[in-house]
A protein has these predicted regions:
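SAM/dcSAM-binding transferase cores
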Residues: 61-138
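A short glycine-rich, Lys/Arg-flanked "PGG" loop and its adjoining helix->strand segment in the class I
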Residues: 17-36
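A short SAM/SAH-binding and catalytic strip from SAM-dependent methyltransferases
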Residues: 1-18
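Conserved class I S-adenosyl-L-methionine
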Residues: 8-13, 41-57
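A structural signal for short, well-ordered beta-strand segments and their strand-loop junctions
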Residues: 38-40, 62-63
């Protein structure tokens, strides 16, 4: 994944990121166990967030750097965007993430599911409290 749109975290636009957990979990469907994703970006926020996204989506971060060109690996192929950002003095961040074959390694839960679970727990607690108060009035 090279220099994808960082989709700032304003509103819900970050959900469109190619490294957002929903996307990374989808990639697990066709990526072989132990398969790798190489990710490069110039965007600091996207990279920092992705450092959390990958493990929550069932990937082990095997290698990472906040300055790819400081000790550039032999495998790196510089893209046009990479060259442009480097000339501007922007450091290129990169990582290699490996798919963990264990489905239990996916710990991410969709935010709307978390909200629903919290709402249901609050409703159950309120119902239990009301039932308890009703028993005390008898």
């Amino acid at each position: 994944i090279n220099f994808c749109n960082p989709w700032s975290k304003n509103g819900s636009s970050h959900k469109h990121r190619l490294t957002y957990p929903r996307q990374l979990i989808n990639y697990r469907e066709f990526l072989k166990d132990g398969g790798e994703i190489y990710f490069k970006t110039d965007d600091d926020d996207l990279f920092r967030d992705s450092l959390e996204y990958f493990p929550a989506s069932g990937y082990d971060i095997e290698w990472m750097t906040f300055d790819l060109h400081e000790n550039e690996p032999e495998w790196n192929i510089r893209t046009e965007h990479e060259g442009m950002f480097t000339e501007m003095g922007i450091k290129i961040k990169a990582l290699i993430a490996r798919k963990d074959p264990d489905p239990a390694s996916v710990t991410w839960i969709e935010p709307k599911i978390l909200k629903r679970q919290a709402r249901e727990a609050a409703e159950a607690e309120a119902a239990a409290k009301a039932a308890q108060e009703g028993e005390g009035n008898e």
